[in-house]
Structure formats: C-alpha cells, structure tokens
Amino acid sequence: MNTPEDSTLGREVAYPSGYDPSLLFPIPRAAGRQAIGLTGELPFIGRDRWHAYELSWLDAQGKPCVATATLHVPCDSPSLIESKSLKLYLNSLNATRFNSAEAVRTRIATDLSTRAGADVAVEFGLPPIDAVGEGESIDALDVSIDDYGPPNAAYLCARAQPAVEEVLTSALLKSNCPVTGQPDWASVTLHYRGAPIDREGLLRYLVSFRDHAEFHEQCVERIFNDVLTQCAPQWLVVEARYTRRGGLDINPLRSSASVPTPLSIFRDLRQ
C-alpha cells in the first residue's frame, strides 16, 4: 500500500522528458479516514476540485499549446492523488504530441481515473475569481487564541436557539504537509442549517489546525466530521480553497447528501 512517505514529496526529482502516467502517485484514503474515526459508510459526499494553471503539450505539427484545466476527483474514490506527482505527470505532457485538445483531455481523465480508482472529470478552463465570495467572515472576532494544535473539536458547539441557515467563512485556515512540513493556506466555507454554531468556538477550532500536519483532503473531512458531531446541523457543507503550489491548487468539498442550495463554484482571490 502506498504511503505519503513513499511519494516524491520532499525529494529532488528530475522533470520527465516524456509522457509518463506512472508518475501519478495514489494514496489510499482509508488510513487518513481511520485517523479521523471515519469507518464504514461515509457521512458525506463530495469531490476534490483541482485547478491546473500550467498545462502544455505539442500539437500534431509540434507547436506548443497551453491551457488551464479543472479536475474533479470524487471523494468516494479509493485513493487521492498526491499533488507533486500530479504536477510531474502534467509536466510529462509538455513534449508529447496530440492530434487535438480533446485527445489531451481524454488522456488526462483516463490516467487520473485509473490511479484514483474512480471516474475523474476533466474540463479545460477555470472557475471565475470572486473577490467577495459567499457568506459572513468570522475572522474579525475579538478573541484571544493560544492553541494552535492539534485540532480541538471541544471548541465547537451550537447555541440553544432556533435553527438558522447561514454561510460562515474564514481565511485563517493553515495546516502543514505531513511529509515536508510546508505550510498549506486556505480559505474555508461552512454552509449549514441548524442551531447557530458558536462563532468564537468555530474560529478557535479552525486556528487549532495551524501546527497540524495532514493532507488538504483529510483536513476538510476532519472539519466536516467534527462540526457534524459537535454541532449536529440538519445538513452541512464544508469547502476549503487552498492557495496555489507548483501550478496547482486543490479545493476539497464535503457535503451532506441532501443540500437544497449548493455553494457557488469560484476561485478565491488568493488563488
């Protein structure tokens, strides 16, 4: 079984000179979910939406083509795709000839689906940037914080008040790569219906990820599971928009099965 330590993270590697799908490094999701306490049927649906900013190949005549792309990896795939391996794989297309852009899109979708173990959708282009976004930020709350990890779900609670539907946001989410220790920065959005979540507690909880080492996808699943357990909303959506690294950014989303108004798809200003 592949582990993060077996990947190319934190290692010097030569950039590929030709197309090589074996560069893609799948990591089983099961181990990370067991660490969160997720066993059996998942309490969420969702996807990992990747934005690729540095995509290039050669046309049939050898002339370079450039594009951007959006990749959708379903969260029920057996494996996630490690980010550095995805970067190296996409770079392996740089000197490869294709008869059409559609042939490139199909090849990427096929290779990613094979490694993830589920159908991965690929489309050219990126969602628009939204400088404002949805919801109400909790970052200006006047709170004292001295806990930066590990994530502490005890901060989360819901007030004994009538149910509301609201969207809360924070740009203060930071965690760290579990292999290299590099910081991962993100804006996070919570959309829910239920008793009002205590905002100061939510902010303290999100900041308690600051020294935590975990992959992006696992952080979002941990947030979803902790909020669901501690606050018991009727339904919940959690999405994190991580900043770009190596020409890629990732946007994991986890959602209850029945959500009447899904979140808009956009890129954060920091992306």
Curated annotation (Swiss-Prot):
A Gene Ontology molecular function term of the record: preQ1 synthase activity
Subcellular location as annotated: Cytoplasm
EC numbers on record: 1.7.1.13
GO biological process annotation, one example: queuosine biosynthetic process
Associated pathway: tRNA modification; tRNA-queuosine biosynthesis
Coiled-coil boundaries: none
Main subcellular location of this protein, as a coarse class: cytoplasm
Highest taxon listed in the record's lineage: Bacteria
InterPro entries membership: GTP-CH-I_C/QueF, NADPH_dep_7-cyano-7-deazaG_red, QueF, QueF_N, QueF_type2
Gene3D superfamilies: 3.30.1130.10
Catalytic residues identified in the record: C177 (thioimide intermediate), D184 (proton donor)
Keyword DNA-binding assigned: no
Binding site for NADPH: S83, K84, R245, G246
The keyword Transmembrane helix is annotated on this UniProt entry: no
Keyword field: Cytoplasm, NADP, Oxidoreductase, Queuosine biosynthesis
Catalysed reaction, written as an equation: 7-aminomethyl-7-carbaguanine + 2 NADP(+) = 7-cyano-7-deazaguanine + 2 NADPH + 3 H(+)
Pfam families assigned: QueF (PF14489), QueF_N (PF14819)
GO cellular component terms given for this protein: cytoplasm
SUPFAM superfamilies named among the record's database cross-references: Tetrahydrobiopterin biosynthesis enzymes-like
Positions contributing to substrate binding: I81, E82, S83, H216, E217
Function: Catalyzes the NADPH-dependent reduction of 7-cyano-7-deazaguanine (preQ0) to 7-aminomethyl-7-deazaguanine (preQ1).
Protein family membership: Belongs to the GTP cyclohydrolase I family. QueF type 2 subfamily.
Entries under NCBIfam families matching the protein: QueF
Subunit and interaction comment: Homodimer.
UniProt-listed PANTHER family: NADPH-DEPENDENT 7-CYANO-7-DEAZAGUANINE REDUCTASE
Protein name: NADPH-dependent 7-cyano-7-deazaguanine reductase
Organism in which the protein naturally occurs: Xanthomonas euvesicatoria pv. vesicatoria (strain 85-10) (Xanthomonas campestris pv. vesicatoria)
